[in-house]
Amino acid sequence: MMEYKYNPEDYEEVLCDYMTAFYRAYEEKNRAFMISEMEHLFSETKYAMKEGDITSADREEMLMYFGGLLDA
């Protein structure tokens, strides 16, 4: 498996699942699935931020990172 900036296991279960699914889609070069997972990541990172699991800066950085993979 490739090395990624964010390890899904460092985050709560739902966010972990979405990150894992995004990375799998990325490795399979399945852009449609990546876009779908990006939508999940967008809402789940918002929830994680509200719960205090991540900061707003963390969320912004994460979304930029995953968006960058999407555009790669």
Language model features: what each stretch is:
Residues 1-72:
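Acidic, Ser/Pro/Thr-rich low-complexity regulatory regions
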